[in-house]
Structures are given as C-alpha cells and as structure tokens.
Regions:
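Short helix/turn-capping signatures at newly exposed starts of structured segments
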Residues: 1-103, 114, 118-134
C-alpha cells in the first residue's frame, strides 16, 4: 500500500494512522480540544522505515493541509539534507527533479498540491500537502 494516494491525498502511515482531506476526528479533534480551527502537531507516525511528524492545519473543522517533517529513519536521526530529501520523495512516491541542487519542488495533484523544500543551512526537508476545497 502506498503512503500517499495521489488521487485523494490520503496519507496512510505504517502504524495504521490516516489523514485525509476534510478529516477532523479522532486524534485531530482531541488535539484541538473541540475548536473548529487551529494547527495541531501530532506525534510521530511510522512510514516506510522512518518516522514522520505531521503538523495539521484545520479550518472550519476540516483538514486543510499537512506538513510532514522527518524525525528519523531506521532509528537514526536524519541529519544530511540529501538523505532526508531522498527519504521524503520516496515516501511520497514522487521523482525528485532536482536531487543535486535541493531546489524546492511544487507538484499539482488531483487533490490539491504539494510543496517539498529543503533548508540549505539545516538540511531539514519538509513536504506540505494542501487540499483543495471540494
């Protein structure tokens, strides 16, 4: 099973946790404390041999975007920019068009869009998945 469904934008983590457009229940609702809007940083969830930390933006009780940060891969903290970027692109099942230059990538998808960027100073690589209103 793929981590990211490219048609719907649903994220399915190895540990069974799921995030999808419009979702505002379970762990998200509990973390928001009943609020209709806000930003929620969830704990790490496994994905393909690593741990990703999702930060979710909720508006009008629906999931609007998810930012994925890498916590570790194979029980080792991820420090090198190229390794982080390679891991994240592999999880998202997307070809990195600029693996040597670390240029930010914008991808338009049926569910919305993805922005994948690497900070050249810290090496931190993140993916922001933005869902289009249905």
């Amino acid at each position: 099973m793929a981590f990211l469904n490219m048609e719907t934008g649903e994220l399915t983590f190895t540990d069974g946790f799921r995030l999808s457009a419009g979702l505002a229940m379970g762990e998200l609702a509990d973390a928001l404390g009943g609020a209709m809007d806000g930003v929620v940083r969830l704990g790490g969830h496994t994905a393909g041999g690593g741990v990703l930390i999702p930060v979710c933006a909720v508006q009008g009780s629906a999931l609007q975007s998810v930012t994925l940060s890498i916590s570790s891969v194979g029980n080792r903290p991820m420090r090198k920019a190229e390794r982080q970027r390679e891991f994240l692109f592999a999880r998202l099942n997307v070809q990195d068009p600029f693996p040597d230059t670390l240029i930010p990538v914008h991808i338009t998808c049926p569910f919305g869009e993805m922005h994948i960027s690497t900070d050249p100073y810290t090496g931190r690589t993140e993916a922001r998945i933005i869902y289009t209103a249905q």
